[in-house]
Design a protein with these regions (language model features):
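Non-globular targeting/processing and membrane-anchoring segments
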Residues: 1-11, 19-21, 25-39, 66-73, ...
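Thiol-based oxidoreductase modules, predominantly thioredoxin-like and allied folds used
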Residues: 37-61
Length: 136
C-alpha cells in the first residue's frame, strides 16, 4: 500500500478494456501503433489477453490505472522521463494523429470519433478496495 505510481516507460501508453465498444473499435489502430513501435504499452483492465499484442500488459488489478487516475478508456498518455506530460481521453482520430504526430492512423473505414467508456478504476463498487490497496 502506498501512493507511489508504478513507473511507465517513456513514450506513449494506452489504457483499454475489452468491455468497451470504443476500445474494440480501435484495435486496428492499436495494432498499427504496436507494429510501428510508436506505442510502448497497452494496459488492459478486464481481460489480460485484450488486445492480443506483444505490448499488452495485464492491469486487471487496476493498480496502474488507479494510480494514474484513469477515468475513461481509452486514455492515451505521453510519458517523458517516467512522468506523464500529456493525455488524451476517448477516441478522436484527428486528436490522436496530432497527439502522436503521425499522418495515417487506422483503416479508412474506422469511425473517426467515439467518446470511450468509464474506467474500472473509478467504478464506485471498487473504490474502497482500490484505495485500501493502492492509497488515494
Amino acid at each position: 500500500m502506498g501512493n507511489s505510481q508504478p513507473e511507465l516507460a517513456d513514450g506513449f501508453v494506452v489504457f483499454v478494456k475489452r468491455d468497451c465498444p470504443t476500445c474494440e473499435l480501435i484495435v486496428p489502430v492499436l495494432e498499427q501503433l504496436c507494429e510501428s513501435k510508436i506505442l510502448q504499452t497497452i494496459f488492459t483492465q478486464d481481460d489480460a489477453s485484450f488486445p492480443e499484442l506483444p505490448i499488452t500488459s495485464d492491469d486487471t488489478s487496476l493498480e496502474v490505472s488507479f494510480s494514474h487516475r484513469i477515468e475513461t478508456v481509452p486514455t492515451l498518455l505521453k510519458i517523458q522521463d517516467g512522468i506523464e506530460v500529456d493525455r488524451t481521453v476517448g477516441w478522436s482520430q484527428d486528436t490522436w494523429k496530432a497527439f502522436l504526430d503521425i499522418e495515417d492512423l487506422g483503416p479508412e473505414n474506422i469511425h473517426s470519433y467515439s467518446p470511450g467508456c468509464g474506467s474500472l478504476s473509478v467504478d464506485p463498487d471498487l473504490q474502497g478496495t482500490l484505495q485500501k490497496k493502492y492509497g488515494s
